Amino acid sequence: MNKKIKLALIGTGGISGAHADGILKHQDKIECVALCDVSEQNLEARAKQLGGSPARFLDWKKMLAEMGNGIDAVDICLPHHLHAPAIFDAAAAGKHILCEKPMCINLDEADKIVKAVKKAGIIYMSAHNQLFTPAVQEIKRMIDGGAVGKVRWIRSQDSFILPNTALKGQWRANMKFQGGGELIDTGYHPTYRLLYLAGAEVAAVRGTMGRFLHPMDGEDTASVQVRFTNGVIGEILTSWVFNRPYGTHDLHVIGELGEIFGTGNMLYHLPVGFKTPSEKILKEANTFHDQINCFADCILKGLPPPHGPEEGRAVLQIILKAAESAEGWQKNTGKK
């Protein structure tokens, strides 16, 4: 493809604002020609942010039918339970897809999505934006370069305090729409970071969950242990009820030759035998800008996406297995 990509944004609330910023940053490659949402207020806000005169729709099926070849790709930023239906319709219409996390809310949907994408011959990219953070990319480079030798243990964390009124009356508090609790939401980020750095398939998963603060069906805090087929032990800690001293998310890798700790654009490397780690300040990055740029390049240059539907399924499988192993956590913590 040698032209500018014509994109439709399906879902114009919340996180779509960050996606829109990425579109504006890379207007030389991609432009938003249509918006779809059931909320007129959301449509108005996003149209104002993007500028121009994108077509507005209340129904994505109608949008896909009426716009036809006027759309090359879609960016899906809907509530979780609507991801799969929108993906199926966009794939059937032959549109390339960027979809927010999670890809869907169960493995049956995930398997059907993998098949639908292959059948349509389109590019599907999972919106794993935190893989574009400087610390994640540098840690991956160091692991692959042997800086810590054989990796033994990886911890991936994403935690912050969400006000206890934030979920009141929201779809995220409802298991039917959310597909789970915090782990399938914010916790999705540290899960895909762990999978990316471990570089192997999952052998076993065990989860522990709790709900300490928020009025919701699912958990607001989760701890997950993962064993990989290459022997790496992984840990995920994610929560909406406590802060971290190093920012909202961080990574810690221990190998036979040393350790790496990273958060945001800061990196610390402690080889075996040293008492003081070396410190490296990495270049700042906007992961949503980089994500949109990557998606556009995949379409324009015919490149495979760095994280497609298979990766989306693998992340979801860890989350669902953790939830299954933690079944009964509400009763165990006295929460009903």
Could you tell me what each predicted segment is?
Residues 38, 281-293:
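Active-site loop of classical SDR/Rossmann-like NAD(P)-dependent oxidoreductases
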Residues 112-129, 149-154:
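Rossmann-fold dehydrogenase core element
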